[in-house]
């Protein structure tokens, strides 16, 4: 487990891009952290590091946003998904099986189920307006 402190959104994005280089196809990145913590900013960095060029946005209303690239990324918001059937219907396991990196916000809603996938855990805590404490477990940067 490693802990990082970022002092700006740009630093959070850069840390995500750095982590992307350490991810294998089909990796699951399980995020925890409150509203506005920086999960989407970190995911923007993942997308950049994976070579995805489309702008990254929060999947809150879409449930999943898919970004094409040399190493594709599926960005899920699990907040409004309530059952494993809903998770399957949204294509969660299909994306993993196809080799996409899957970034899952609000992963604590399915902690036991996602644990079976051997996730890389990223916890982002809001320290102050610009500072974030980011704990990464399951991959070495």
Where are the regions that the model predicts?
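Conserved lysine of the Walker
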Residues: 39
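N-terminal pre-Walker A segment at the start of P-loop NTPase domains
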Residues: 1-18
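Short beta-strand-centered segment that lines the nucleotide-binding/catalytic pocket of NTP-utilizing
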Residues: 52-67
């Amino acid at each position: 487990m490693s802990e990082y402190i970022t002092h700006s959104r740009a630093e959070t994005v850069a840390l995500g891009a750095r982590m992307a280089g350490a991810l294998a196809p089909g990796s699951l990145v399980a995020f925890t952290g409150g509203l506005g913590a920086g999960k989407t900013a970190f995911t923007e960095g993942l997308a950049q590091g994976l070579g995805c060029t489309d702008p990254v946005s929060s999947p809150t209303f879409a449930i999943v946003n898919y970004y094409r690239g040399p190493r594709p990324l599926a960005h899920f918001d699990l907040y409004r998904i309530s059952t494993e059937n809903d998770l399957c219907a949204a294509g969660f396991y299909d994306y993993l099986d196809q080799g996409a990196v899957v970034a899952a916000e609000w992963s604590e809603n399915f902690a036991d189920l996602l644990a079976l996938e051997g996730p890389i855990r990223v916890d982002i805590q809001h320290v102050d307006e610009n500072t974030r404490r980011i704990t990464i477990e399951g991959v070495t940067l």
